[in-house]
């Protein structure tokens, strides 16, 4: 099975299955000299882990991370960083009825069609459980980018037909983690929670969307044609299970705008740098960053694991039969996907920062003395 690695310079390679022994990720390309400990990773994993509230799965995973390579005396060494998160609360027995009877709208049939077999416990590799690895890797990327003044943030801006009004970046930083829905507009968050409860009571689920934004990203990142920043970021977001759309700037609303309205005149900022007068393009022009905030929206369909009675077929007996998907599942995805979106945004931006030479890929220039003293007292000075 290919397709388990993301990134060119900052490479994230993952393994693990929903009900296997553990999830794991190897990060190659992290520069030496980054101060890093498990607590840095754990803080982000705790935001994503299950069992946080009544609107998340009740699966009781602590998601405790163990760093087993690439870090010495609290600093990265420049070698691959290995991280393992054990699965502590897997219960595969409830999935036995689906071994030969695919659950509607899951990856059960397609994985079997491709590989001739599949790990049926909890959906195996197709499960969103796998995103725990991405958040672990994203925590490292986030820590590096923070040192360069780059900050990514996301919040849930729509659940079903309930949409939040626009909020500022500062409001996202302040309010997103204040409620279970992770919506930065408190009043809308309450209405969203009520709607989720309504569907959950009916044994159903609901979709939604996440607004994301990154600030401090320099101009000039991206490699057109097929490796532009929006293309790669789109790949990152579409890799998140259940993602149905990704858009930047005006997104689908751009079809209603005349060119004379959407086009933005150029002007100079207070430092004398050329800058568009607006940012309807989401910080991206020609597939390359403009230096303005990158922003957009990603949408998720409703979770497919629901207890409502549905129809399937048993390819072993040749019969059509009723099916009810039992187990512990999320009634809505965006609240737990917020840290996943932030992780993929951070990973993608860091990869381009390394590719374009904005960050030294071998060692962090901001703190070379610490690395020299702690690790290699006889090594040459940083150029």
UniProtKB/Swiss-Prot annotation:
InterPro entries: Chorismate_synth (IPR000453), Chorismate_synth_AroC_sf (IPR035904), Chorismate_synthase_CS (IPR020541). Pathway: Metabolic intermediate biosynthesis; chorismate biosynthesis; chorismate from D-erythrose 4-phosphate and phosphoenolpyruvate: step 7/7. FMN binds at residues 125-127, 286, 301-305, 328. GO terms for molecular function: chorismate synthase activity; FMN binding. Its cofactor is FMNH2. The keyword Lyase applies. Reduced FMN (FMNH(2)). GO terms for cellular component: cytosol. Residues 361-383 are annotated as: Disordered. It catalyses: 5-O-(1-carboxyvinyl)-3-phosphoshikimate = chorismate + phosphate. Its EC number is 4.2.3.5. Keywords: Amino-acid biosynthesis, Aromatic amino acid biosynthesis, FAD, Flavoprotein, FMN, Lyase, NADP. GO terms for biological process: amino acid biosynthetic process; aromatic amino acid family biosynthetic process; chorismate biosynthetic process. Belongs to the chorismate synthase family. This is Chorismate synthase. The lineage of its organism: Archaea, Methanobacteriati, Methanobacteriota, Stenosarchaea group, Halobacteria.
């Amino acid at each position: 099975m290919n397709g388990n690695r993301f990134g060119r310079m900052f490479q994230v390679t993952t393994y693990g299955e929903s009900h296997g022994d553990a999830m794991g990720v190897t990060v190659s390309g992290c520069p030496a000299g980054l101060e890093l400990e498990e607590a840095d990773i754990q803080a982000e994993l705790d935001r994503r882990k299950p069992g946080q509230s009544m609107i998340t799965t009740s699966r009781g995973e602590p998601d405790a991370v163990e760093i087993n390579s690439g870090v010495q005396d609290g600093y990265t060494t420049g070698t691959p960083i290995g991280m393992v998160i054990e699965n502590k609360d897997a219960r595969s027995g409830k999935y036995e009825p689906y071994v030969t009877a695919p659950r509607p709208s899951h990856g059960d049939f397609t994985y079997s069609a491709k590989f001739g077999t599949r790990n049926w416990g909890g959906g195996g590799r197709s499960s969103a459980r796998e995103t725990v690895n991405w958040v672990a890797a994203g925590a490292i990327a986030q820590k590096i980018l923070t040192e360069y003044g780059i900050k990514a943030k996301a919040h849930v801006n729509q659940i079903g037909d309930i949409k939040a009004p626009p909020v500022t970046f500062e409001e996202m930083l302040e309010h997103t983690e204040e409620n279970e829905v992770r919506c930065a507009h408190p009043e809308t968050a309450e209405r969203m929670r009520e709607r989720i409860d309504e569907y959950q009571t009916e044994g159903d689920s609901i979709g939604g969307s996440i607004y994301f934004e990154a600030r401090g990203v320099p101009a000039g990142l991206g490699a057109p044609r097929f490796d532009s920043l929006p293309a790669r970021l789109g790949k990152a977001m579409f890799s998140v299970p259940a993602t149905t759309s990704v858009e930047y700037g005006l997104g689908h609303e751009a079809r209603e705008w005349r060119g004379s309205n959407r086009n933005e005149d150029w002007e100079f900022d207070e430092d004398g740098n050329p800058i568009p007068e607006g940012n309807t393009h989401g910080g991206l022009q020609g597939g390359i960053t403009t230096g303005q905030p990158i922003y957009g929206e990603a949408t998720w369909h409703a979770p497919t694991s629901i207890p409502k009675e549905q129809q399937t077929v048993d390819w072993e007996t040749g019969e059509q039969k009723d099916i009810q998907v039992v187990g512990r599942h999320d009634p809505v995805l965006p609240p737990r996907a917020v840290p996943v979106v932030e992780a993929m945004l951070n990973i993608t931006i860091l990869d381009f920062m390394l590719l374009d030479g904005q960050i030294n890929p071998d060692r962090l220039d901001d703190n070379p003395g610490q690395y020299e003293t702690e690790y290699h007292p006889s090594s040459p000075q940083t150029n």
